């Protein structure tokens, strides 16, 4: 397996990488379900990553154009959910807002689909499919940015118990236990990234190891 070259952007490379269902199921099983085999490739279907929508505010529509890196519909016990992976190399100090807007756009799209169906099916009922967004961070530094919306706010003590929050599931690939991955391509990717960053900090690391030319 080849990692990104100077002609290939890492985000684009990883986007295509996790488009494969077996890889997606394996990484999500590790980061979301403690390595339990909750998902399998047969329980997944790739979804449209276009999150573009229009928000109406007091008759002043605001268009929002964005694309997810990877979006998959999963089935767990016959119940559907949407899981998105966003690949992040740099620390983004606005990422809770970004993922909040992405998820809100997904719910908005589901609501619009319901309204469209309601026009010809009066029996249609609104039942939202839950959405989970996982951010795979593979930057050199330890993540120092906010993880929730509340991390970005200063609140009066009286409001801290009633303010809605939005958690961003940020996973630092440098901290993953690659041995728990069952997909070989995933193990090669995560171990390769971890070795790369360890090599940057310790030149003796690679001297003690014979590296494949592939």
What are these regions (language model features)?
Residues 1-214:
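Elongated, amphipathic alpha-helical interaction scaffolds
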């Amino acid at each position: 397996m080849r990692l990104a070259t100077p002609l290939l952007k890492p985000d684009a490379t990883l986007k295509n990488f996790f488009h494969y269902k077996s890889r997606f199921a394996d990484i999500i099983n590790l980061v979301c379900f403690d390595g339990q085999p909750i998902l399998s490739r047969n329980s997944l279907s790739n979804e449209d990553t276009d999150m573009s929508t229009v928000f109406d505010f007091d008759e002043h529509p605001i268009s929002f154009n964005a694309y997810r890196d990877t979006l998959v519909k999963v089935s767990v016990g016959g119940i559907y959910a949407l899981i998105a992976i966003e690949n992040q190399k740099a620390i983004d100090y606005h990422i809770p807002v970004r993922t909040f807007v992405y998820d809100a756009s997904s719910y908005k799209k589901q609501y619009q689909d319901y309204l469209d169906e309601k026009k010809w099916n009066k029996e249609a009922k609104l039942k939202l499919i839950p959405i989970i967004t996982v951010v795979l961070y593979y930057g050199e530094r330890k993540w120092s940015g906010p993880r929730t919306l509340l991390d970005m706010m200063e609140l009066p003590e009286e409001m801290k118990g009633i303010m809605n929050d939005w958690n961003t599931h940020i996973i630092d690939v440098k901290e993953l236990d690659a041995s728990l991955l069952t997909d070989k391509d995933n193990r090669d990717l995560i171990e390769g990234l971890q070795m790369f960053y360890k090599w940057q900090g310790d030149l003796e690391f690679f001297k003690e190891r014979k590296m494949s030319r592939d």
